[in-house]
Amino acid sequence: MDLNRRVLSSGAAVLGALVLASCGGGGGAKHAGLQVVAAENFWGSIAGQLAGSKATVSSIIVNPNTDPHSYDATPADARTFAAARLAIVNGIGYDDWAPKLLAASPLSGRITLTVGALLGLRAGDNPHQWYSPGNVMRVVAAISSDLTRLEPADAAYFRGRERAFETTALARYHALIAQIRARYRGVAVGYSESIFQPLGAALGLRLLTPSSFAKAIAEGTDVTAADKQTVDRQAQQRLIKVWVFNSQNVTPDVQRVNQLARAAGIPIATVTETLSPASDSFQQWQVSELERLERALARATGR
């Protein structure tokens, strides 16, 4: 793993709320010496499973009703981040509040893993990389590497946790991705926003929605009249087989397309921005979404 893509930060801020479990999402004893804080609970869930009993892992954004794009950090978040020896930030313009908290609370030896920097992405690129199966695995490797850098005596333990997470905890996740890709590659789908693009591409689906429409919905900017007409027509004429929308960001434009899709008899699947329910592990959440998508594709195609 290229450690130069991750920033060894002198700043630290705090986040707190949810203590995530070890493999499978269950509870377990935590080591008070290594504090890990993730800005979002999808990365926090993964970190908790990789760290096991060797760290306390907390996530700042844990409420499924919270919009991470417009989140206002609290003093409690700052206190939580301040204690972090490993901080995990999404970056890519998604959680700009998090680096500010970290910079306000320096901690010698802290490692800040910024997912965007790891992946070579910048503000303006698609920030929803936890929906990219390949990039999820790169983040898994980076978290495991950083845990080992902080606690080298536990290197063998962290390697074992990483192997178990990849081969056991994520087994159903990987199997569903391969199954959907094999059965439904090339099926035309529409989607409300850019959150679905990385997963849809990995599944081999034909993404018909204009990327400018999806980006505008994700960023809360105005959708062009031309894009509205295109997306409406795709639903009305059943040019898409399935419609996928982010249930945490239902704008009037999304509501309109939802209604058009239902009227046209197009199966609908939902995704969410963060773990939903918040008690789910990363893999439970993703598997549930993949299963819903697979059912929608099966209804649409009869396969």
Residue ranges and their predicted role:
Residues 2, 22-303:
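Extracytoplasmic metal-acquisition and chelation regions
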